[in-house]
Amino acid sequence: MLTISVPATSANLGPGFDSIGLALDMQLTLQVLQPSDHWQIDHPFGADVPTDERNLIIKTALHLVPDLQPQHLQMASKIPLARGLGSSSTAIVAGLVLANELTGATRSSAELLEVATQLEGHPDNVAPALLGGLVVATNTDGRVRAVKLPLPMLFASVYVPNEPLLTTASRQALPTELAYHQAVTGSSVANTLVAALATQNWDVALPLLEQDQFHEQYRAKLVPALQTVRDHAHALGLTGTYLSGAGPTVITLGDYGQLATLQAQLSQDTTLTGQLFLLPMDATGVKVQKS
């Protein structure tokens, strides 16, 4: 049996808009049960998620290999849909690896990343899903360039609101252009953040996660929990709270003990009715097991 596991991802790390992402230890697992005369995928997400060729995992696999032999698949996932934790990216990566494995192809991670970025539109979710850990990536001149940084010895306090926020709606909240001085500030903050992440200088990196100039201020009205969680963190002397992906999930990075204290506070706030997770990073990205 072929089993593929793909980690959840958190993109747009602070000012790292569309470019910095990390993998979290929350998995989508895909099992290949047996060949079939038609595509079928069993999953726990109900009627809104297709179980045939319209399913994103299968669509992606067929994009890579159009004549792929149909299979009966089973998918389990702890990653909530449309919450800013890379649910679509994990499906895309699972589909690409599925096609790669079923055909015995030897496409490299770099080749799969190129295709995944074409399908997703930007690399900051698909790159950590493929590679694991903390990844800085860009898609320019028709080429994806990704750099995997040392794995942060940090944990993530993850607050997931009950209501989804579709990426399309969240994107519509963004301006079509930025003032020059704001763009320069955003660039300098992002550059310094990357340097701090690369050297694991958390005294610099964690505050900079809250200095985004590109998207959070425009999306904040759609995600009131962002300021609420940040206020609780600041009351404990913690920085490092940011909007994960397009939202609505809010993440705070830090020490396990400090984040456990934060989550105890968040659980007492009656305005926060969603789910809380305290997660380590995923170091390896997509994994394949054959049995």
Curated annotation (Swiss-Prot):
A Pfam cross-reference name: GHMP_kinases_C
InterPro entries: GHMP_kinase_C_dom (IPR013750), GHMP_kinase_C_sf (IPR036554), GHMP_kinase_N_dom (IPR006204), GHMP_knse_ATP-bd_CS (IPR006203), Homoserine_kinase (IPR000870), Ribosomal_Su5_D2-typ_SF (IPR020568), Ribsml_uS5_D2-typ_fold_subgr (IPR014721)
Enzyme class: transferase
An MF annotation (GO) of this entry: homoserine kinase activity
Pathway info: Amino-acid biosynthesis; L-threonine biosynthesis; L-threonine from L-aspartate: step 4/5
Superkingdom of origin organism: Bacteria
Function, as annotated: Catalyzes the ATP-dependent phosphorylation of L-homoserine to L-homoserine phosphate.
Protein's name according to its UniProt entry: Homoserine kinase
